[in-house]
Amino acid sequence: MINTIVVGTDGSTHGQNAVTWTAELARQLGARVVLVHVAPPLGPPIVGAGGYVMYVPQDVVDQTSADLQERVITEFCEPLRAAGLAWESRVQQGSAPIVLADVATGVGAQLIVVGTRGQHAFGELLHGSTSHGLTLQTELPVVVVPHGAHVTQRSTLGAKAQG
């Protein structure tokens, strides 16, 4: 049975569609949702042209992280609030497939949900997609939600039968 679902979002339209889809599914299953936004690392040194090393000051890192957490809670989590679900949100830095798989394992999730394509299309070209990377990082089922998809009663029954 699916009790906990991890949904990854980057704030794009596709990511928000995955959150809305997850909210519909979780409402029908009575599952809790852990929304995860994975941000690129801000803190390590950056080597610039000519070998110059630049650092992002810690206060800038802290403020940026706090602002992002607030945006995640106020904007990205709205479908979860509207559905009346038990949910939590997390903002973590790192590689999206690794972070999502680690969070899913840590919270005991039975399912991971992501959108089809987010804001990092150029990064996907260089490093591979989040959804593909997830399939290499976890043994959990990964649902890739196409833009505009909706949960139907039929898909919910299928999800319950697999549990």
Predicted regions, residues:
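Structural beta-alpha unit
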Residues: 1, 14, 28, 75-112, ...
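Small/aliphatic-rich secondary-structure junction motif
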Residues: 2-55, 83-85, 162-163
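Short, well-ordered secondary-structure micro-motifs
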Residues: 18, 45-48, 101-102, 124-126, ...
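Conserved beta-strand positions in the Rossmann-like core of class I SAM-dependent methyltransferases
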Residues: 34, 88, 143
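Short secondary-structure boundary segments
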Residues: 37, 115-117, 146-147
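A short acidic, glycine-rich active-site loop
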Residues: 54-71
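Glycine-rich, Arg-bearing micro-motifs that act as flexible, cationic patches
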Residues: 111-137, 151-155
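Short, flexible loop segments at boundaries between secondary-structure elements
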Residues: 142-150
